[in-house]
Design a protein with these regions (language model features):
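Conserved alpha/beta-hydrolase
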Residues: 103-129
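Catalytic active-site module of serine/aspartate enzymes centered on a nucleophile-bearing elbow/loop
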Residues: 330, 334-359
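Short beta-strand element of the alpha/beta-hydrolase
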Residues: 80-88
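Active-site glycine-rich loops that stabilize anionic/oxyanionic intermediates
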Residues: 87-92, 96-99
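Conserved acidic catalytic loop of the alpha/beta-hydrolase fold
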Residues: 183-205
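The feature captures the conserved acid-bearing segment of alpha/beta-hydrolase catalytic domains
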Residues: 234-314, 319-321
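Gly/Ala-rich beta-loop-alpha elbow adjacent to hydrolase catalytic centers
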Residues: 207-216
Length: 359
């Protein structure tokens, strides 16, 4: 005897199973659809012909790589525009999932709020590790560098009042979240793949973090399906019209001066057609300091403000929010997974509503 399970019943069963997890949603989420796919990428073909008797010879064989991987979930009755999430350097889609201390991340929080979510692993990272160019992964101890650079504190000490759990297991999970590039990072390759994702999602809001900020601008320039950009602590690759880039910003950071990238005026003007908001956390210096992590993010915040000013001077809509300036204290480089991430989610949801993006 065969049994048929309706799509709604299957979704309800999935919701129950999801909610049985130790780190479950605060309330059940009924999913209409869930799945994954690859987007973009290229195919390399070796010269010659494939020889069945010598299959390890690459002649005539193909290599599919440099694509993005996407995991998505769509709740029943979802808002019109989905949210597409792009991680930063040394990270993967895990950035947006369960937080290091086991709470709901933005994936779950915004599913609960009725948004379809699409989580990207960019080319040459995470589940999109297949590259069309060779690369080397060097196993170099660097956890404490990232702890410090991401402004949880000055390793091994946490900053006073920082929004990060002091549970040792949370720090263990935080470090294990780091993941390498399988080959050289290429902003154009990433932007092309993100644009291909947008072709599949159609109109959506793009949410980026750190290194993902720069490729996010390029994807928004390239693809009109990007209807808004929300960027958390973009760290580099701010774009300006050719001839209008600011001078490099000096810092005590080991990364060295921060330079701006340039695009054509026509390309830059595409960024003036969509709303953009940029968020930065706490423990960022106000003036030059030898405390390099705070100084590194000082110049990045400064460049973001120059970027916003350039957009707004052309009639655009770009806002930079330094969270301490609005009374939100203690955030690290990861506001969306910090202890107060629901407060950050409220800010983001409020902005989406203000811009009419949550219909």
């Amino acid at each position: 005897m065969q049994y048929k399970i309706s799509k709604t019943l299957a979704a309800a069963m999935l919701a129950v199973m999801v909610c049985g997890n130790a780190y479950a949603f605060e309330k059940p989420v009924l999913l209409e659809d869930q799945g994954s796919f690859f987007a973009g990428g290229t195919v390399v073909t070796a010269p010659g012909s494939f020889d069945y008797t010598n299959p390890l010879n690459p002649a005539g064989q193909t290599l599919h790589g440099d694509h993005a991987y996407v995991f998505y979930q769509k709740p029943v009755g979802a808002h019109k525009l989905p949210l597409v999430f792009l991680h930063g350097a040394g990270q993967s889609k895990k950035t947006w999932e369960t937080t290091p201390d086991g709470r709901d991340g933005f994936q779950n929080i915004f599913l609960e709020r009725g948004f379809a979510t699409y989580l990207i692993d960019q080319p040459r990272r995470g589940d999109a590790g297949q590259s069309t160019v060779s690369g080397t992964i060097n196993a170099v101890p660097s956890d404490q560098f990232w702890f410090t650079n991401f402004r949880a504190g000055n390793a091994p000490d946490f900053f006073d009042g920082v929004q990060f759990s002091r549970d040792p297991e949370a720090l263990n999970q935080y470090y294990r979240q780091l993941t390498p590039d399988t080959a050289k990072y290429d902003a154009k390759v990433v932007a092309d793949a993100v644009s291909a994702v947008m072709d599949k999602t159609s109109d959506a809001v793009l949410i980026t973090h750190s290194q993902g900020g720069g490729t996010g601008w390029l994807a928004a320039i390239k693809n009109p399906h990007v209807k808004a950009v929300i960027s958390f602590e973009p760290g580099s690759a701010f774009v300006f019209p050719k001839g209008e880039a600011p001078q490099p910003l000096k810092t005590s950071s080991p990364f060295g001066p921060l330079t701006a990238d340039t695009v054509t005026v026509a390309e830059f003007d595409r960024l003036t057609k969509i709303p953009i908001v940029i968020y930065y956390g706490d423990n960022i210096a106000e003036s030059y300091t030898d405390e390099w992590n705070k100084d590194s993010w000082r110049i990045r915040l400064d460049m973001a403000q120059k970027f916003a000013a350039a957009i707004n001077a052309r009639g655009g809509d770009c806002t930079v929010v330094h969270l301490p300036d609005i009374g939100v204290k203690g955030n690290t480089h990861f506001p969306f997974s910090d202890l107060n991430n629901k407060q950050i989610a409220d800010l983001m949801a409020g902005w989406l509503h203000e811009k009419g993006l949550d219909k």
